[in-house]
């Protein structure tokens, strides 16, 4: 298959369309830069949109609480003011600096060119840890779920949630008032989730099965109909009827090809200085993918790092530009 080529050279290309990448792209527009975003998923929003769109976030400044998808939608609206070029479903495989100082970015579908690059790829590419039962894959896309995009699809249904971390407990609590019944199964006696959430779980109508694991899936072409649970210590088995199974065993993340781009990597993160500069001039990193002394991995911190990365890229392209931008209230 031939790879397309976009010969336009952008001022800045943002790799990763999560919250930090989206805000970086907006800020690039604010600083009158020509911006492109390349995102591997089919939609913007990163893990917020892919993993927990229905969950509330409580540590974004100015929002007492905001649903993850609502935050993504607000970022999209903010971004739309400057109409950046957005390339979805593309994974950057190679990043090369050319003789003229510009960068060539090769994805699985297209070749791109840019004067600077900002990497905001979060934890890198991520895949869910799947249910290790031979027949599980045949139910994916039916009623076996690793991602949840709409809680209402479980209304009035008998739901089994597998896992013992924050996601499993949080989804169980959110499903309780909607589903006909919710059962959570965890292989250990104690949950790893936040203490307050576990307390809520124990006081809810959610049926808790510990220490059990799903041992067998019984179903047909339409999906899973029953799940056989096995007691981890005693080996006793019981079968429960289900309409849907949600697996929250966490995710496996990897920097993937980024490790081969010549960047200084420390503990699966890209090392940057206070200007968000990497060891490659013209390449910057922001958000969860970067690290420096005192780094905290929060969306709120990524929102602060994005304008620094953009302003650094701006002065790299134009040394006469000011690092300190004008206040946005004076621009519109």
Swiss-Prot record:
User: Which key words tag this protein in UniProt?
Assistant: FAD, Flavoprotein, NADP, Oxidoreductase
Q: Which reaction does it catalyse?
A: 2 reduced [2Fe-2S]-[ferredoxin] + NADP(+) + H(+) = 2 oxidized [2Fe-2S]-[ferredoxin] + NADPH
Q: Which cofactor does it need?
A: FAD
Q: Is the keyword Cell division assigned to this protein?
A: no
One family from Pfam that matches here is Pyr_redox_2
Cite the cofactor comment.
Answer: Binds 1 FAD per subunit.
Note the InterPro entries from the entry: FAD/NAD-bd_sf (IPR036188), FAD/NAD-binding_dom (IPR023753), Fd--NADP_Rdtase_type_2 (IPR022890), Ferredoxin-NADP_redctase_2 (IPR050097)
Documented EC number(s)? 1.18.1.2
Q: Where does FAD bind?
A: 20, 39, 47, 52, 92, 126, 288, 329
Q: Which residues form the signal peptide?
A: none
Report the enzyme's class at the first EC level.
oxidoreductase
Question: Any idea which GO molecular function terms this record carries?
Answer: ferredoxin-NADP+ reductase activity; flavin adenine dinucleotide binding; NADP binding
Q: Which family does it belong to?
A: Belongs to the ferredoxin--NADP reductase type 2 family.
Q: Which HAMAP family match?
A: FENR2
What is known about its subunit structure?
A: Homodimer.
Q: What is this protein called?
A: Ferredoxin--NADP reductase
Organism source for this protein? Geobacillus thermodenitrificans (strain NG80-2)
Q: What is the lineage of its organism?
A: Bacteria, Bacillati, Bacillota, Bacilli, Bacillales
